[in-house]
A protein has these predicted regions:
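N-terminal signal-anchor transmembrane helix specifying type II single-pass membrane topology
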Residues: 30-62
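Structural recognition of the beta-strand scaffold that forms the well-ordered cores
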Residues: 102-105, 137-141, 169-174, 238-244, ...
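Mobile, glycine-rich extracellular loop/lid and propeptide segments
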Residues: 168-283, 288-300, 613
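Extracellular mucin-like PTS domains
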Residues: 507-508, 513-540
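Surface-exposed substrate-engagement region within the catalytic domains
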Residues: 118-126, 299-471, 569-577
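N-terminal, immediately post-signal peptide pro-regions of secreted/luminal proteins
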Residues: 60-91
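Intrinsically disordered cytoplasmic terminal tails of membrane proteins
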Residues: 1-32, 75-76
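N-terminal carbohydrate-binding/catalytic regions of secreted carbohydrate-active enzymes
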Residues: 93-229, 441-471, 475-483, 495-502, ...
Length: 613
């Protein structure tokens, strides 16, 4: 399949993308092409340039001080301050893809819940009944789930969501890399770099060291098939994709595990994720893509986060993604956001709500002890590590409604006394960073099996972590857990028992938009679970809404470059360096004479507009 080329201009280009902070998202009715501001005052140009340079100098200075990396310090030169990474972001990265949308609820999930409702009673039954109308993601964890006509397939789900009076937003988890789940066994996948005789993956056999056969299977039989479905529905309904949970975080922290650190697995993960992002972004430019970013209890330490940033930078995918998904299939508490990075470390501010630390991570010098703090810290690290990239986050709240239910935060499998958390909502605590809370892991689906399955057979994918003291099935009298992804009735009833849904404060709309809100999650018919007359719909924002400079690529006039070239020819030293850097800095064009309006060259308004278009 053909993949669209990199968004960077090969020759340096005549466009520079400089991020300008905005209180509101830009209007979706404006196309993401180059914007031109025709100045009538020199102050406009001066203010814009001053703001961009001041912001860049400040961010680079902070980065050099915080990270101490030579690569960051090198950015301090004046020329490099001007030469910001040239990013042309796709439509999918322009604004919050969840804002103003009705969210899809899968009938197949409702059917699973109905089985548990039939044997439940009291408050647990009532909560399970409420959960039937709460949207969640659908996992594409094997090739058989891509095509089809039922809501057990990606294609069938998209057709169903498109059939609603208002097409509904669907979230898919892309999860089928070769040598999947290298640091655990519970979710090992169907595609391998090297197959054993029983069809399972041999993680220790690196074969050619590149996983060529596994990657070929992944690309042609999995990603390309998803891409074909996306092309069919592109632009017809909103789609969000979360790419390969656990994969890149494992490469950042678990290379000592030979299953993760061998050359075949590393190649499979890096090349596979890079291909998936670029192929799926090309197939549906409207789809919003988020990469998995583990969680604060995994990558929250500065060294771990730095390694993860370097991994992302090496893939060159920042142009194609909206940001990152955290806590996918995890139990990390949402918490409250702190005002500064190290606010809680060293025993400071222990009484502040944002420093609540149910896992004891702060004592281990991890400042990302909750997922909101982690979102803020990851965004800051990414912005410094990849200049021009300002990612947004979504947080999995499917099972993090309870804090402090684990003896150790590293325990991840079918955690006892967990509760479902915040229902799908864009009313997040930090809306400029976190796009949405969403149930990414389907509550009720097992994380992994006990050593003996419910039917008495030995589980072939048993992971010792699923026998931890915090895992359901490890205590006498508890039922055994089924394999990962299978329905676990006992677990979903506990999740309902300890639920913390935040129904009274939920909206499926951006809180800054003046549209109808709901007091609960949207159903598949776009209805609230508490008020059937209140629905959320996609809405067009008026052209005057929001900062017109935010998230735009700015035009640099070739005529201005020609003028600068005459001065560059006679300059030297620092002046020459700075003049060369100014060649790629956008500025306004003055319509100070009538003959500058029409024409075909970039010395006219008409010619400039044609060139920018």
């Amino acid at each position: 399949m053909s993949i669209s080329p990199s968004h960077f201009d090969e020759d340096g280009g005549n466009e520079v993308h400089i991020r300008v902070a905005a209180n509101e998202e830009p209007s979706p009715v404006h196309p993401r092409s180059s914007w031109i501001r025709f100045g009538i005052s020199l102050a406009c140009m001066t203010a814009l340039l001053s703001l961009a340079v001041a912001s860049l100098i400040g961010s680079v200075a902070d980065s050099a001080e915080t990270e101490g990396d030579a690569e960051q310090t090198a950015l301090m030169s004046t020329a490099n301050v001007f030469r910001v990474a040239q990013r042309r972001l796709s439509k999918s990265t322009a604004s919050n893809p969840f804002a103003g949308k009705s969210f899809y609820v899968n009938p197949s999930y409702r059917t699973s819940l109905e089985r548990s409702i039939s044997t439940a009673a009291g408050d647990v039954k009532s909560t399970l009944e409420s959960m039937r109308d709460i949207p969640s993601a659908y996992w594409l964890d094997n090739k058989g789930k891509i095509t089809g006509s039922t809501t057990d397939s990606m294609e069938g789900i998209l057709q169903d969501a498109l059939s609603k009076p208002v097409p509904e937003l669907v979230v898919f988890i892309v999860y089928d890399l070769p040598n999947r789940d290298c640091h655990a066994k519970a979710s090992n996948g169907e595609i391998c770099c090297k197959y054993k005789s029983d069809g399972r993956c041999d993680y220790t056999d690196v074969t050619d060291g590149q996983c060529r056969a596994g990657l070929k299977e992944y690309k042609e039989e999995y990603i390309d098939q998803i891409a074909a479905v996306l092309r069919k529905y592109s632009g017809q309904l909103p789609i969000v994709l979360v790419i390969e949970p656990d994969s890149l975080p494992n490469l950042s922290t678990n290379q000592d595990d030979l299953r993760c650190g061998n050359s075949a697995t590393m190649s499979a993960y890096k090349r596979g994720v890079s291909y998936a992002v670029k192929a799926l972004a090309a197939a549906d430019p409207h789809a919003a893509i988020y990469l998995d970013a583990g969680h604060g209890g995994w990558l929250g330490w500065k060294d771990n986060m730095r390694d993860y940033v370097r991994t992302i930078r090496s893939l060159d995918v920042a142009d194609h993604i909206r940001g990152f998904a955290s806590n996918v299939a995890g139990y990390q508490h949402l918490g409250k956001a702190c005002s500064t990075y190290d606010y809680c470390l060293g025993g400071q501010h222990n009484d502040d709500e944002c420093c609540a630390d149910p896992c004891g991570l702060i004592s281990e010098w991890n400042p990302s002890q909750n997922e909101l703090n982690y979102a803020l810290h990851l965004r800051e690290a990414m912005s410094k590590g990849i200049p021009g990239f300002i990612p947004h986050m979504i947080i999995d709240t499917g099972r993090n409604g309870v804090a402090g239910m684990r003896s150790q935060c590293k325990n991840w499998c079918n955690v006892r006394n967990a509760g479902v958390g915040h229902v799908a909502s864009t009313a997040t605590d930090v809306p400029d960073v976190v796009d949405a809370y969403f149930w990414l892991k389907t509550p009720g689906e097992s994380d992994g099996c006990t050593q003996i399955l419910p039917d008495g057979a030995t589980c072939p994918r048993f992971d010792a972590d699923c026998a931890s003291q915090d895992s359901l099935g490890s205590w006498p009298g508890e039922p055994r857990a089924p394999e990962a992804g299978q329905w676990f009735d006992y677990q979903v009833k506990q999740l309902a028992q300890f639920a913390n849904l935040h129904l009274s404060e939920t909206t499926t709309l951006d809180p800054e938009e003046t549209t109808t809100t709901t007091t609960a999650a949207s159903t598949s018919e776009g209805e609230s679970t508490t008020d059937s007359s209140s629905t959320s719909t996609m809405e067009t924002i008026a052209p005057s809404t929001g900062n017109p400079f935010a998230d735009k690529v700015y035009y640099v006039n070739p005529s201005y470059k020609e003028s600068l070239s005459t001065s560059i020819a006679t300059a030297s030293g620092v002046i020459l360096t700075n003049l060369e850097a100014m060649m790629d800095v956008p500025s306004a064009y003055w319509l100070d004479r009538k003959n500058k309006i029409t024409g075909s060259t970039t010395d006219s308004m008409e010619g400039i507009l044609q060139d920018a278009l």
